[in-house]
Design a protein with these regions (language model features):
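Conserved small/polar residues in nucleotide/adenosyl-binding loops
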Residues: 206-208
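Core alpha/beta nucleotide-donor-binding catalytic domains of modification enzymes
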Residues: 1-203
Length: 208
């Protein structure tokens, strides 16, 4: 019996229009979402499967970051995947706006890889919960109704495109899939911190 999540992912991937064997760059944090995305891509039928390469950034924000780096390095070696690694050194961390600065560093790194390698597609593991949070954050910040647009499943990025093939999947669905298939991943310790608007909204929504 085919796995429902894998069947649905195949349908979403087909919509992305990426040719089979096309090289794609997957942004991986070692969390549940990105490790599940990696697994789903590798389990695509051969006639649909892209050539996967991985981009990982150690942001030096968590005590477990060295373990995460070792984990993704060994994972890529075991699965024969090209891995691009970078470190955001602590000395460059700002005192305020660290989450946004980390994101900017990360995406500059992804863009540089694409420019240097000619890879056209960047994949991230944003899911439907991220989509809902983005719209809610804009509403909380006073956005007009017309401006309350969430995350797009595809957009131009650098010299290529940014694709989000998990955007129609819930966090719960991805976690259940990971458990069913014994996919190893790291919990993001920073999600337990209640000092960023997105995490505050997440905690509040989980309380109700």
């Amino acid at each position: 019996m085919k796995d429902k999540t894998e069947v649905e992912f195949q349908a979403e991937w087909k919509k992305m229009g990426v040719p089979a064997n096309e090289t794609v760059l997957v942004a991986v944090s070692t969390g549940c979402d990105s490790m599940t995305l990696l697994s789903l891509l590798q389990r695509l039928p051969e006639k649909m499967r892209p050539t996967v390469q991985v981009a990982y950034v150690d942001h030096q924000l968590r005590e477990q970051s060295k373990k995460e780096t070792d984990f993704i390095t060994k994972y890529c070696q075991k699965n024969g995947l090209v891995l691009f690694k970078n470190v955001w050194e602590k000395e460059f961390h700002p005192k305020k706006g660290i989450e946004e600065s980390a994101r900017e560093f990360r995406y500059r790194f992804f863009e540089k890889i694409m420019e240097e390698t000619g890879i056209e597609y960047l994949l991230t593991a944003h899911h439907s919960n991220d989509q809902a949070e983005t719209i809610l954050m804009k509403a909380v910040r006073g956005g007009d109704l017309e401006q309350l647009v969430g995350i797009k499943s595809a957009r131009t990025f650098g010299t290529g495109k940014l694709l989000r093939p998990l955007l129609h999947f819930s966090k719960e669905t991805l976690k259940e899939y990971a458990e069913r298939n014994q996919i190893k991943y790291f919990e993001d310790e920073t999600n337990a911190l209640d000092d960023v608007l997105r995490n505050r909204l997440r905690h509040r929504s989980e309380e109700h």
